[in-house]
Amino acid sequence: MAIDSKPHDDLQLFKTNLHPCGYWPDRWASDLVMDPNDPRLGAIYPQALAWGFRRSGNLLYRPHCEHCNACVPVRVNVNAFVPNRSQRRCLARNATLVTRIVPAERNAEQLSLYRRYLHQRHPDGGMDGHGAIEFDQFLIGPWGYGRFMEIREPATNGTPGQLLAVAVTDLTHQALSAVYTFYEPNAAARGLGTLAILHQIHWAQREQRPYLYLGYWIKDHFKMDYKRRFQKLEIYDGYRWRPFSTTYPTTHTL
C-alpha cells in the first residue's frame, strides 16, 4: 500500500491489520495511523494529541478496534490538579532527588537503564530485546518536540548521582505529552512512575501548558488503571474532552 500525501491533500488515515492486543492477551486490536509520509505531520501533531492520538517514533496512531473501546484517551488539567495523600507522600519520599530536562538524545547510561527496565519489568513483552536502534526509533521523535526528563540521586563531589528514571516527554506549544517512562526496577518502593507524572505536571505548570496527555486509560487494567488517580482528569469521548468518569461511554468517531 503506497501512502504519500502532498501538502494540499486531505489528511489520510489508515487502519492497520489486526494484531495481538498489547493489553489483553485474548484480544486482537487495530489502529488508525496518520500517513507517516505526510510532510505536515509535525505541525499536525499538537492537534492530533487533542484528537486522542499518540506518538510512537514517527507514527501517530489511535486504537480503533471493532468490538472494543477500552482504550480511552486521557489528559490532566494541570491547573486544576490537586495531589492526593498518596501522591504527596511520594513527593516527600523523593524530595532529595534531582530532576533535570535534557535534549532527547540517547546516551549509554539511559540505554542501560532502559534495557534493564524492560528486562525486569516487561520480560517476554516483545520489547525486552531492544537496543540502541529500537530505542531511537521508539522514543526519539523527528519533529523536535521531544525532551528527556531525568530523575537522579543527588550529586556527590560534583559527580551526577545515579540515574533512576527517564520520562520521555513531548513539549508542544499547547501541552505536554508523556510518551514513555522507564526507571530503576530495583527502586520500586520510591514510586518512580508516579513521581515522574507529578514532575511532568509541575513542568507543564511552569511552561504554562494547560494539559499533560497521559495516553490511554483502561478501566480495571492492572497496568493502565493508575491514570485515574491524577485528578482533575479529562477523557476524550470521540467528539470532545469531558470530565473523567469511570462509566462514561466512548466511541470510535473522529
Swiss-Prot record:
GO aspect biological process, one term: ubiquitin-dependent protein catabolic process via the N-end rule pathway
Taxonomic lineage of the native organism: Bacteria, Pseudomonadati, Pseudomonadota, Gammaproteobacteria, Lysobacterales
The name this protein goes by in its record: Aspartate/glutamate leucyltransferase
Substrates-to-products reaction catalysed: N-terminal L-glutamyl-[protein] + L-leucyl-tRNA(Leu) = N-terminal L-leucyl-L-glutamyl-[protein] + tRNA(Leu) + H(+); N-terminal L-aspartyl-[protein] + L-leucyl-tRNA(Leu) = N-terminal L-leucyl-L-aspartyl-[protein] + tRNA(Leu) + H(+)
Protein family (similarity comment): Belongs to the R-transferase family. Bpt subfamily.
Enzyme Commission number(s) from the entry: 2.3.2.29
Species in which this protein is naturally found: Xylella fastidiosa (strain 9a5c)
Subcellular compartments: Cytoplasm
Keywords annotated in UniProt: Acyltransferase, Cytoplasm, Transferase
GO cellular component, one term: cytoplasm
Gene: bpt
